[in-house]
Amino acid sequence: VLPGHAGVEFTLSDLESAYNAAAAGETVDLPNATVETPDVTAEQLQKVLFCDVLSTYTTKVGGASGRRANVKLTASRITGYILNSGETMKYGPLVTPFTAANGYSAAPGYLQGKTVDMVGGGACQASSTLYAAALYANLEIVQRTNHGFASDYIGLGLDATVAQGGPEFEFRNNTNYPIKVVAEYYTSGGKDYLKVTLRGTKVDDSYVKIKTEVLETIPFTEEIV
């Protein structure tokens, strides 16, 4: 946050008149000019920016080492992202392309109804964890698509798939203050976890509760061994 500065407001016609009436080297006054000072000081902003945890969501990271590496990499590419009021955050542009040259490993992922090895497999765990955090922070969801299968690392209805040239996850900061994304990959008790925290400024004590309901169960018709 940069310090604020006072400004002076005046009309060009007043300035032109004073300039034309002044002698060479003379200092003139603009009697109708007004001094405008900032409504909020830098010190006041420092006290309210990112001072509250709007939400936090944690998922357990499992699978092959390549998958865990991909989750850790995507987390590192979204952490620290700041959305000003009214701005949106798109997940895809921050983490793609899913290529070896961009640091990604081959790992299992969903593709056209099947689980296959692909470069960047597991990248959707970060988008899903971020989506859940955005939901619990009551932020506006602009784009979100679920996986074709339920994901074992997150609850029903809380996943968000992202694919290069395909589904995207995007949400908007619909609060009046900036929001910072903090993504942390850590190990505890020999297990890996991803925690996404959204920091901002709370203006009330409201909170979000999410409830899922099974509307229909479709029995399988093919048994895959």
Where are these regions (language model features)?
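Well-ordered beta-sheet/strand-loop patches within structured domains
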Residues: V1-V225
